[in-house]
Amino acid sequence: MRAAGVFRTVSKNVATHSARKAVEGLLASSSDINGSVLDDTVVQKNCSLHIRGNLLGDLTIESGAKVVVEGSVDGKIVNKGGRLVVNNKAHAACVTTDGPAEAEACGVLKIDLTAIVSNWEKLAKYAAAAECAAVVKGNAYGCGIEPIAGALAKTGCRTFFVSDIPEAKRVRAVAPNATIYVLRGLYAGTGQAFAEINAQPVIYSFTEMAEWDLFVRSHRWAGGCALHVDTGESRLGFPLREAAAFAPSSRSYGITLLMSRLDNPEKPAHPLNDHQISLFCDLRRLYHGIPASLANSPGIFLAPKAHFDLVRAGAALYGVNPTPCADNPMFPVIELRGRIVRVLSLAPGETIADSVGWAAKRPTRLALVSVGYADGYPRSGRAFDDKLQAIVGDRRCLIVGHPSMDLLAIDVTDVSDPTAARPGNMVTLVGPEISIDDLAAASKSTGCEVLSHLGRRFHRIYYAI
């Protein structure tokens, strides 16, 4: 028998009255459940749960916790260092680390590889007949190319998009059979580097195409390339008329993918979406037989007609909301915690460095946390507006003033647990209560930007089951 509060249910939806009663019983006293559990459930640190039935909701297992399920497990499982036994078969967490040692680091960044794989599977299912490629550019949006590309390749992802040749080499090391496209295109004199790792450049101009064709022919190499066409973004790519004129002779250039990019897929009603899809359909007919790709993460949710032969899953893989006008359909991927290094007491009227006009209005306790803009925590666009927050103990607290290079200041005056705000303890900056999109909105940024800026001073933990 366990005391109240051992387990925490985080589901917003309870499917049936019986499920609600089962969860109430779980919260009240018992670590044993006779029957199936429909709710999403968190088993907290060093606690245990025995389910004599099926687990139909999602399950999070904290460090040191143990869960035994005698039936089937149909929900998503996030194992953060606990132990899971399903029908007498152990499912241990696979944990790898990177960066400085945890005791020496300013904070801890946990990256859930199981969630990334689940997000890819969800996007692939939504894309139906189209292949789902993974965009791992920018060091997998700051999350780490090798562990993420490796996990996705093992799951069945066959195609990856990277920023440059160094990133292509890193993907090739963990995905030896994958197709790899390099989005920054062909730099002069880099043909041999592409050939050595069997990667393909995304070609944006006749100049690049001519150099690539010369290299391929002179080296008698059958390497392919992607042709990128500008259908309305006005950034990179062949102008539409030039691409149409080039189509009759394109067969001899080894083009393996025709691609473009939607400019406003986050806004489903934007008229440019249908216009770009129509233009791309017309162009695809001229390049008959060559696979085509238009949709990025938001484009996958736009309409099936935007999917074509291949979709490019990027930010959504990492938990960023691809549908800003609706609830986030993706699983969260990261948890970021920072270390308290000092707790200050301020009298009314006192300020701190980088306070940008903030002053204590009452006797105030501030926790200084060793995370700052050098670690990628956002600073630009931030004014004192009560938007940036952190979780200290079980309470949501305001971050006051500007983040400095190495520090955040958090108002912990109202934290009731006297042990929560102590030097050495961790606070949550991104997690279940504060998503990456919440942090981005509060700092007038985007989820992609915040993720990509997360620095190398964190102790990184990659975990999966």
Can you say where each PLM-predicted feature lies in the sequence?
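Conserved beta-strand positions in the central sheet of alpha/beta enzyme cores
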Residues: 161, 181, 202-203, 259, ...
